[in-house]
């Protein structure tokens, strides 16, 4: 069994967190699923009182860049976020349609649904340079994957809040820390 990543909390670092959907299936591949994710992410942000520097929601994973929460720790935040999103998005799919990704497995005790991979990747962001690097990585992710030709066209990231001055469902706390660039809205 692979060793667990060591999580370091309590240093007041920012955390770059990546979490994947079960078996990398595109369970966040619809507009509805991504919007549900963002609404729940904002609710969790308010409940656990943490700053959000940036985020991107991709079809089969997400990245968030957050400060350590006032309540709990990043693991607690991820547990609540993942459970809430899975509960909300799996609830209407009690019966699987033929075009819906497989979310069920039988482990001998009955049917169990899966939405997320069991673990997540957490990288402590220890400098302003690393924070800017991770933010750029998130904003460029949809472009690098070929989902859109430019980051401002992907509506499920913090890019538009930073560079297009568009309100985000999720409150972004570091808007003034990143230099503005002219968006390429085509």
Tell me what each language-model feature is.
Residues 1-186:
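Short catalytic/metal-binding and nucleic-acid-binding patches
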